[in-house]
């Protein structure tokens, strides 16, 4: 935690200057990360327990394990999905940024932290990218942990009637 807090503290002036876009991006990004997982798994015919296991894939394993208990999913599948998400994000993040021409370390870091909890990969870009990745990781985990257990009982009956 201290390893993530110190770089964030050093970038606090930058974070303060963009706090509104950070909050908006966190809510939209967390919703899309979970929503796309839910939709694709459902579209492919996955059972409710599998869909519920994949929903928290973009947050850290300890948080995902607790969240998946409220969705009725499998803890081991959720942990595997989290690991795969992190690995894929770390592997393809740099390529995606090059293809899209993203050079701003704040954006690169925040995107890696939000979507793939790839903090180490973000630190390879810069300390600023790592700080923003750590911030995104924490905020996305918080939003997902608070929202998904509350929203799942509303979403699940719609996707899996009867």
Where are these regions (language model features)?
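Hydrophobic alpha-helical transmembrane segments of integral membrane proteins
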Residues: 3-4, 109, 145-146
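Transmembrane alpha-helices that form the ion-translocation and gating core
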Residues: 24-64, 85-102
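Discrete transmembrane alpha-helix packing/kink hotspots characteristic
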Residues: 89-92, 144-148
């Amino acid at each position: 935690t201290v390893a993530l807090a110190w770089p964030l503290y050093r970038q606090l002036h930058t974070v303060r200057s963009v706090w509104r876009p950070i909050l908006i991006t966190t809510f939209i990004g967390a919703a899309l990360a979970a929503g796309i997982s839910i939709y694709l798994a459902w579209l492919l015919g996955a059972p409710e327990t599998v869909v519920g296991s994949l929903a928290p894939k973009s947050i850290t394993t300890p948080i995902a394990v607790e969240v998946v208990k409220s969705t009725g999913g499998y803890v081991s599948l959720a942990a595997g999905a989290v690991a795969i998400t992190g690995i894929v994000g770390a592997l393809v993040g740099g390529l995606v940024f090059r293809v899209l021409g993203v050079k701003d370390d704040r954006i690169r870091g925040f995107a890696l932290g939000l979507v793939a909890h790839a903090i180490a990969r973000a630190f390879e870009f810069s300390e600023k990218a790592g700080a923003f990745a750590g911030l995104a990781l924490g905020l996305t985990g918080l939003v997902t942990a608070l929202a998904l257990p509350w929203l799942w009982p509303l979403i699940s009956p719609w996707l899996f009637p009867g």
